[in-house]
Amino acid sequence: QSIPQNSHYGTELQYVVDTDASANTYAKSIQDSFNAVGATNLVSYPDTDLADQLKTVARLIRGGIQTKVYMVTIGGFDTHNAQNQGSGDINGRHTDLMNQLSTAVDAFVADINSDTIGDDIIGLTFSEFGRKAIQNGNYGTDHGEIAPMFVFGKPVEGGISGVNVDLTEATSNNNWQLKTVQHDYRQVFATLMQDFLGASD
């Protein structure tokens, strides 16, 4: 059936058809890379959703796909309650989430560093918001304005950039927020884009 020309309906329908065709093309490319000779994982990964995502990324890269940026996700950090199990107890939901993050990233880094693909890979964490610097009444923390970032990979010079936050900055007058930003996340992204991926200014 032909698509009507010179009409809003026809334009929108053509967009849907083109999008469908592009999705099929991209799906074929992903499938080919995932199933390519040599597209394997060289280490074992934990049995978690985040680890499965990173495991797939490593396999796609080893399979020769040319994608420059991948995004994987882990949910559950909006810890308004049960962030820990009680006063003075560090165990709880936040500890479990950090364990999932660290073990998945550890496996991914070990995998990509098992051969030369790790020479060209940098990973970093980001979130849509941070947490306040005070516990609420439900053993959790509410939305805050700053948060740490983890940057990892063989090209990264390891260490801590910045200094410990000044917790005295968080008071009832500013709703227990830490306001001093040491590294703007946009600048971190820009640095990686320019210095590592070769993007222009």
Where are these regions (language model features)?
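Feature for exported/extracytoplasmic and membrane-associated proteins, marking the mature portion
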Residues: 1-114, 134, 148-201
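Hydrophobic alpha-helical bundle architecture
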Residues: 111-117, 123-142, 150
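Residue-level recognition of the N-termini of beta-strands and the immediately preceding loop/turn
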Residues: 68-70, 119-122
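Glycine-rich and small/hydrophobic secondary-structure elements
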Residues: 145
